[in-house]
Amino acid sequence: MLVFGKDQNGNDVKNERQQQGVNFGPRIKCPYTDVRLIAIFHEDDRDYAKYLLHYFKHGDYGFKNGNYRITDDSQRKKLSQYIGTNVEYAEKELHIEFKDRQNPVKEVKEALEGEAYQNLDTNVKYVGIYVSPFHKYASEREQKKCYYQIKEMFLQHKIPTQCIDSDKMKAQQKRDVEKARRDFIYTLQNMGVAICAKLGGSPWLLDEAKKEELIIGIGAFKSDDRQYIGAAFSFDNTGVFNNYSYFQKSELDELVGAIKMAILNYSSVNSKPDRLIIHYYKKISRKNEFQKLEDMLHELSLNIPVYIVTINKTESEDIVLFDENSTYNTRYNVAKSLMPYSGKWINLGRTREGYRYLLCNNTRYENETFKATDGFPFPIKLTIACPNRNGEIETAVVQQLIDQVYQFSRIYWKSVKQQGLPVTIKYPEMIAEIMPHFESKTVYTDRSSLWFL
């Protein structure tokens, strides 16, 4: 179960589905009271950028949308609703309109070096809304480079950015007008959730009693034949994100040192953790990697179990599960899906690295309606080991660790959709993908901000 904001009676809102719960506001509001939006756009996209900012502030397009009419405020999905604080437009001189569609970096850089940006109001938190001529997955190397350069330049001014592909945005807005619909609202909903996290808020959390344990995720992304490791430091068991660090593959000592700092920082606010849980993107070397970690724990006089949960990024297709009673409704009848309930798992037996398990991670929840449009993902493989303890891991502990992987797949704050992998793997991978494109390793001072979403 997930927990969101408050209802009209001041009670916590709990829901299985992110898309429904976010309408009650964030679990933890962004800490700023004055948030202002800066538009960054090509001159041909001026009107679309204007409509986009209007939608963020007012919850509607700002122009006649076919036969569609907003009849009451409950239908408006303003950005303020998702971040928990008021939103205004930035000062006129801060908006940036560029002419070079293929390489806007020079114009954006000149604007950021101008007087307006050198004298920003320190009492205001600015967010850049970048209507990009191309997206970060662009095939052209130079286009991709531009995307990341602009993101880094704004971060140097402590301004997180939310990007949207210009062509996709225009196509969706056009369809909405032609069909008198508001489907673009779902894109805005995802963007609102991401902006909340970029501003240090938590759109939703896990409905779990807080435990004295530390969860650290280590993931990787390979770019240009070099492998980078990004480590998301760290989470508590409710999903609260605390910190992150970034390393190259060869910097194992730095990685262990960062885990040490995460433990010390955690212990300075809470009691010492009762256990350390590491979600790892690959099999861990007992001799080369875990030994350094064990030595560090000994140095801290911390005699706690360390559970290594290896999470295979590739969905399992050689071994799958079926549920004969699993169905879903089509337009005409009831069809079999064969997909087990989300969170179900089975034991695949023991290997040299530990015990292997198969976890179903989808959107079929008990006592909830399943939508075929959510897809039918294959389960994922996990391996669980506790290298610094002898004997088998208790079944109850295994259940807790597997359920934690499943639950951490539900606090992905870039979308209201359930993910196949936990954020302990996805977030580090995202950091590792972005950082090689940045000139500086240190680009943002607020470590509680998920600026990379």
Name what the model sees in each region.
Residues 13-23, 27-31, 43-45, 60, ...:
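Aromatic-residue detector
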Residues 71, 78, 93-104, 109-123, ...:
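Long, contiguous domain-sized segments
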Residues 1-31, 178-205:
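Flexible inter-domain linker/hinge segments
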Residues 9, 18-145:
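Long, charge-dense tracts
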